[in-house]
C-alpha cells in the first residue's frame, strides 16, 4: 500500500469526522467500487482496511447498483457492509441470490431506494407521463394496494423490512411529516407478489430516467 493512497483516504475520513463532530463512523462505503478493479484497487482497499484497523471506521464496503458489480468484486475483496437498491419492482439482488449469499457470509446488507425515488408512492394522477410505457404495471400495483387496503408507502416499507437477509433500510425524507408517517407505519411482515418484479433498467434505474 502506498503512503499517498492511505494519506488521501485517511484525510477524507478525518475531515468527515470533523464535520460530523464524531470520533468514528459506522460504515465507509466506496460509491464507485469498480475502481477496485483498476491499478489503484489493491492499494485503495488496503487503505480502507487500515483506517478500519486504527479505529476510524467500524465497517468498510461498497455501495453498488447491479449484481454484475458484485460478480466482479466478490472474488477479489470481501466487504463488511454492502448497500444495494431494493424495492417491490427491483428485486435483482434477491433473485440473483446475492442477498442470501451475503447473509450466509456475514456481510451486513443495507438497502436503499425502497420507494424508487418516490415513484412507487406517487398517486397515479401524479405519475409523470414518461412512465406510461409501464402503465400495465401501475394498474396492477394500484389495484393490489386497494385490495390489501394498504398505502404504497406502507407496502414498500414493510416489503423491505420483511426480508430476512436485509439488516438495515436506508430512507430519505423531505419533511418531518413524512418521517412521522414512516415511523408510525406497521412493521408487520408483508409479502408483495413476485409479478411486480421488473427487469427493465429504464424503469428501475433512476439514472436512465432522463433518457425517457
What are the roles of these predicted feature ranges?
Residues 32-204, 208-211:
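Beta/alpha (TIM)-barrel catalytic core signal, keyed to glycine-rich beta->alpha loops juxtaposed to Asp/Glu
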Amino acid at each position: 500500500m502506498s503512503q499517498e493512497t492511505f494519506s488521501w483516504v485517511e484525510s477524507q475520513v478525518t475531515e468527515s469526522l470533523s464535520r460530523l463532530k464524531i470520533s468514528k463512523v459506522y460504515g465507509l462505503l466506496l460509491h464507485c467500487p469498480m475502481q477496485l478493479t483498476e491499478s489503484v484497487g489493491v492499494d485503495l482497499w488496503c487503505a480502507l482496511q487500515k483506517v478500519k484497523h486504527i479505529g476510524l471506521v467500524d465497517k468498510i464496503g461498497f455501495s453498488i447498483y447491479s449484481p454484475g458489480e458484485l460478480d466482479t468484486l466478490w472474488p477479489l475483496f470481501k466487504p463488511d457492509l454492502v448497500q444495494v437498491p431494493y424495492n417491490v419492482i427491483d428485486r435483482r439482488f434477491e433473485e440473483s441470490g446475492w442477498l442470501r449469499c451475503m447473509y450466509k457470509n456475514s456481510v451486513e446488507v443495507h438497502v436503499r431506494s425502497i420507494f424508487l425515488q418516490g415513484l412507487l408512492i406517487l398517486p397515479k394522477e401524479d405519475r409523470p407521463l414518461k412512465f406510461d410505457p409501464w402503465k400495465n404495471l401501475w394498474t396492477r400495483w394500484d389495484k393490489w394496494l386497494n385490495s390489501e387496503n394498504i398505502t404504497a408507502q406502507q407496502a414498500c416499507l414493510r416489503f423491505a423490512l420483511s426480508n430476512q437477509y436485509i439488516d438495515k433500510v436506508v430512507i430519505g425524507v423531505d419533511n418531518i411529516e413524512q418521517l412521522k408517517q414512516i415511523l408510525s407505519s406497521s412493521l408487520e411482515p408483508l409479502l408483495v407478489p413476485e409479478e411486480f418484479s421488473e427487469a427493465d433498467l429504464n424503469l428501475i434505474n433512476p439514472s436512465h430516467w432522463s433518457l425517457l
